[in-house]
Amino acid sequence: MATDIDMLIDLGLDLSDSELEEDALERDEEGRRDDPESDSSGECSSSDEDMEDPCGDGGAEAIDAAIPKGPPARPEDAGTPEASTPRPAARRGADDPPPATTGVWSRLGTRRSASPREPHGGKVARIQPPSTKAPHPRGGRRGRRRGRGRYGPGGADSTPKPRRRVSRNAHNQGGRHPASARTDGPGATHGEARRGGEQLDVSGGPRPRGTRQAPPPLMALSLTPPHADGRAPVPERKAPSADTIDPAVRAVLRSISERAAVERISESFGRSALVMQDPFGGMPFPAANSPWAPVLATQAGGFDAETRRVSWETLVAHGPSLYRTFAANPRAASTAKAMRDCVLRQENLIEALASADETLAWCKMCIHHNLPLRPQDPIIGTAAAVLENLATRLRPFLQCYLKARGLCGLDDLCSRRRLSDIKDIASFVLVILARLANRVERGVSEIDYTTVGVGAGETMHFYIPGACMAGLIEILDTHRQECSSRVCELTASHTIAPLYVHGKYFYCNSLF
């Protein structure tokens, strides 16, 4: 029977859908009832076994070699699939004539020999067995027992039984092994999962060694718990609260009205004026016989720049004397530095430009006499105050001016502090003051001349005292005429002449 079935499979026929198989099963049952002494009752029908690729495990030659070469079946069973199944040699004589080849088997012709290298086409390619054998859903007699020959134990013929094949429908009924039969599910170790091919199947029979199993479902995978961390667990983040003023702070703000009074404000002004009468605390700069005595002493009233005007020649002649006074009196110099910082931050634009010229002219005098640039000096040590006040006064105007000239912005000039960014008098003042302020903030003991753009053996000849004020006023006036913006014109005009004409609308004070 196995030989005929191979012939049908090679022809691309599906035995599961033909009526021959059903007819063969019926005739087989009748033959078994007629012959109760037959030992083939334990055999499985060729359509009930797992089908395997005839090209595997030795190919067609191995299958042909495994087919029993006994005498043909009884004549009365010829012409049916089951009747062609070989019977034991004891029930048929050696001289009996072979059965007549009638019926469908004779019409199909001679079986074509299959080559082990030639792949099967048609339906055979689609019904190749899966990687693992699936248990027959009916169980019972379908499983094959090991060690049993073709005709049962003690049979006369010891020829090995050929591999059985199953139709496509029977294979689909078995399906793959269920996930419960796997050994790599939850609770199984890694070694057990690797030895899954050697574990017992659901039906109780051992699986072939080395066969692959179907992947387990996602929920059956064993997940390794995360390693315990010795650090404390991160507390859960709370939702950000609303951004409000603390009630205690609100109470403090409202309590100001309880303490504010005209008398108390007046007393505060009086105490501040008393402190300013002697800012040095009885230890001022020694001014006896000094050409700088008028400026070293304290005075009441405002500052008049014209009364303090000196020429470059006078500064060169008497500048070293003032320099030595600052260096010889560090405590007085520290007080003078603090007082100068407060004054510089309250100046208008013209006064701020004069302070910038004062700082640069002082540096030029020091370089002229080869004196170190000391950060503790009251004039050099307050370069940051001059820069911040100038930037505040010039920012509304410089935003338009620097952009129109294609230069770096105000903040970039002050933060980069590069000599290569200097393109005009405005950028020169801002960059040099920013470099001096940076050195003072870093706390260096001495500032080198390259900070102000002077190389070794050079003098600050490119700077003329007064260039800051004259150059910035010129820039303001020129850009005001060139720019078509009315806002820029108003800004430049008020920067040069800060006269109040409009802007403030009320003054409200409910306390005093």
Swiss-Prot record:
Write out the residue ranges of the motif Nuclear localization signal.
110-138
Task: Give me the stretches of Acidic residues compositional bias.
Answer: 16-28, 36-55
Interaction with host ALYREF: region residues:
104-112
Name the segments for region: RGG-box. 138-152
Q: Where are the stretches annotated Disordered? A: 1-242
Organism (species):
Human herpesvirus 2 (strain HG52) (HHV-2)
Q: Quaternary structure per UniProt?
A: Interacts with host RBP1; this interaction facilitates the RNA polymerase recruitment to viral transcription sites. Interacts (via the RGG box) with host ALYREF/THOC4; this interaction recruits ALYREF to viral replication compartments and probably directs viral mRNA to the TAP/NFX1 pathway. Interacts (via the RGG box) with host SRPK1; this interaction relocalizes SRPK1 to the nucleus and seems to alter its activity. Interacts with ICP4; this interaction modulates ICP4 DNA-binding activity. Interacts with host NXF1; this interaction allows efficient export of HSV-1 early and late transcripts.
Which molecular function term from Gene Ontology is one that the record holds?
A: zinc ion binding
The modified positions for Phosphoserine read 16, 18, 113
User: Which family does the UniProt entry place this protein in?
Assistant: Belongs to the HHV-1 ICP27 protein family.
Q: Mainly resides where?
A: host cell
Q: What is known of its domains?
A: Binds viral intronless RNAs through the RGG region.
Q: Where, in this chain's numbering, is Zn(2+) bound?
A: 400, 479, 483, 488
Zn finger intervals (CHC2-type): 400-488
Give the sites modified to Omega-N-methylarginine. 148
What is its biological role?
A: Multifunctional regulator of the expression of viral genes that contributes to the shutoff of host protein synthesis and mediates nuclear export of viral intronless mRNAs. Also stimulates translation of viral transcripts. Independently, plays a role in the regulation of virion release. Also plays a role in the inhibition of host innate immune response by targeting host IRF3 and thereby preventing production of beta-interferon. Silences the 3' splice site of the host promyelocytic leukemia (PML) intron 7a, thereby switching PML isoforms from PML-II to PML-V.
Sequence motif Nuclear export signal, residues: 5-17
**What protein name applies here?**
mRNA export factor
Please report a single Pfam family linked to this protein.
Answer: Herpes_UL69
Q: Which InterPro entries match?
A: HHV-1_REF-bd, ICP27-like
